[in-house]
Amino acid sequence: MVTTLLVAVVLLALIFDFINGFHDSANSIATVVSTKVLTPFQAVLWAAAFNFLAFFLIKDHKVANTVAKTVHENFITMHVVMAGLIAAIAWNLVTWWFGIPSSSSHTLIGGFAGAGMTNAIFMGVNPLTAVNTHEILRIAAYIVLAPLIGLVIAYVITIIILHLFKNSRPAVAERWFKAVQLVSSAALSFAHGGNDAQKVMGIIYVALVASNVITQGQHMPDWIPLACYSAIAAGTMSGGWKIVKTMGSKITKVTPLEGVSAETAGAITLFMTERLGIPVSTTHTITGSIIGVGLTKRVSAVRWGVTINLIWAWIITIPISALVAAAVFAIIHYL
């Protein structure tokens, strides 16, 4: 049954999706802006277009299915979904304000799981029974693996490109790579849209199940993907300039050649994990790729102080969003 609460939760989910877009737009445009291939305004329009293009080409929704299964059905209520979304939105806004490229994906999953576990406590059962530990552990593993995969792929691609173009004139090579970077940034934006919009699709799906509008296992209504891809593309168009600065220059200085390597590595990693149905962080992935590029110069080319601060932000994202969601759920429960 469609209720005011369901409408409010769907709107909250789309607000989160929009915030995810402007929070994570930096991931897909940072290198193309820092190399001056596109202006910031051109870059966000470019990224938003390819975010939305994923709606037409990605139809399996494997990532959405994984997100929907992170909390067991009998522990999911509308208040659980609402608390998880409020926590995720709050942490995303905090990290955006301070220019910290944390993971919107893990914020959402942490909030959803934290609210579900708190509901289990109020039901008088072990909170761990509320979550699908297999899926949670799989997601947790890729918190580490996704940036490492991006790092290795970017390192290898950069070494290969440097070898192939070692005799080319620098000015000619730079012009060529600036053109190619339009393609690599488009691929990264497409992969970002395909991966991140699905996470919100999964949340809206479980909200509809909890409201008895649809049953578990029923086909996802067509309006959900359309709304989610539209929201993330609109958010991307609004930009996130604080994070662009961190991603595009504070980790390591990036040339057009290196931008192509980082974006290609990030896109490959995101395409691979999407096929596996694993909701990974675009932020973590592209950061690992940029570090991989920096390592081809020398270890000191990577600004490890900034990188370590980012890693700490990643580590605390799921626990903090889970705790905030637990507090929000408790407040809603007692109101």
What are these regions (language model features)?
Residues 1-335:
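Multi-pass alpha-helical transmembrane bundle typical of ion/small-solute transporters
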